[in-house]
């Protein structure tokens, strides 16, 4: 795979028409050398038709045939993939999950994205919504409270909210992952306590995947995944879940998965969307 050109433009936040225009302006200088367009987008994406039943962070794409509209505008083949699933595809084809039969990707950010690999294939689901971890409930007794969803328990957003509360800071106090891990790496007790709680929340969901899908590996992505302390703590807490039930005869033979960092970072969506395009049009 050879990268010829790179660049970025701001994503329009107002209308789909402006979004399509921005994409067309990117396409136009290369139209004579482009066979097709592979693109990762947020939301629930029908990869076969390019129809979005939910636009995610770009709500103007909800209930629209975005793939068809872009194909008509540019006059070429278009393949749309959900951004989390594209990242999982990149890891499966050329990253941390190469050779895996069953595996998963957790992308920890504003919410929790990613994808699931089963029998060596990306799982999209009947309605193309498989792997939408943000909506997974973590507390059946608290079903009516959305704060019990993984988006509010296993995301960077949650980590920073808990840290502000632990420090007695206002909810809108400036805070980011870099500042948090500076404190945690310096051994600050409050930061380490919050990190332990956070890793327990994530580890329980990895445990659930282990039981449900018998995954070999779970690859962790997102900005904070670059922090060695996160992976170190997460692995220790995950192993501790098994150790805490070590005397149960019913746990005997239950395998543990390997927790690894994603190989790709910001380019994962592009790489994964390209592989999805090649599968759709060249396999």
Tell me what each language-model feature is:
Residues 2-3, 52, 122-123:
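Hydrophobic "anchor" residues
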Residues 1-36, 46-49, 70-76, 93-100, ...:
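ATP-binding/phosphotransfer module of carbohydrate and carboxylate kinases, centering on a glycine-rich
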Residues 67, 78-103:
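Conserved phosphate-binding catalytic cores of ATP/NTP-utilizing and phosphoryl-transfer enzymes
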Residues 41, 48, 118-119:
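A cytosolic small-molecule/anion-sensing beta-strand core signal
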Residues 83, 109, 273:
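Active-site glycine-centered loops adjacent to acidic/histidine catalytic or metal-binding residues
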Residues 50-62:
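A charged helix-plus-loop insertion that forms the helical arch/lid used to bind
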Residues 9-12, 60, 125, 129-132:
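A short acidic/small-residue loop/turn micro-motif
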Residues 98-153:
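Glycine-rich phosphate-binding loop of actin/hexokinase-like ATP-binding domains
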């Amino acid at each position: 795979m050879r990268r010829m050109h790179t660049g970025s433009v701001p994503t329009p936040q107002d209308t789909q028409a402006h979004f399509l225009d921005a994409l067309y302006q990117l396409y136009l200088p290369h139209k004579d050398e482009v066979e097709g367009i592979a693109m990762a987008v947020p939301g629930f994406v029908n990869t076969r038709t390019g129809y979005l039943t939910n636009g995610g962070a770009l709500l103007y794409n909800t209930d629209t045939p975005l793939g068809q509209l872009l194909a008509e505008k540019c006059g070429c083949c278009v393949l749309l993939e959900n951004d989390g699933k594209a990242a999982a595809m990149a890891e499966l084809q050329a990253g941390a999950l190469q050779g895996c039969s069953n595996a998963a990707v957790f992308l920890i950010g504003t919410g929790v994205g990613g994808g699931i690999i089963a029998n060596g294939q990306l799982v999209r689901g009947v309605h193309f919504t498989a792997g939408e971890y943000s909506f997974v409930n973590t507390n059946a007794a608290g079903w009516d409270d959305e704060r019990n969803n993984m988006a509010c328990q296993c995301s960077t957003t949650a980590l920073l909210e808990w840290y502000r509360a632990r420090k007695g800071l206002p909810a809108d106090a400036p805070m980011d992952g870099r500042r948090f891990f500076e404190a945690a790496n310096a051994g600050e007790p409050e930061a380490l306590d919050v990190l332990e709680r956070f890793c327990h929340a994530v580890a329980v969901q990895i445990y659930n995947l282990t039981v449900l899908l018998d995954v070999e590996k779970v690859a962790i992505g997102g900005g904070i995944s670059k922090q060695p302390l996160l992976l170190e703590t997460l692995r220790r807490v995950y192993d501790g879940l098994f150790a805490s039930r070590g005397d149960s005869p019913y746990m005997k033979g239950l395998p543990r998965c390997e927790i690894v960092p994603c190989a790709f970072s910001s380019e994962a969506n592009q790489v994964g969307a390209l592989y999805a395009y090649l599968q759709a049009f060249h396999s």
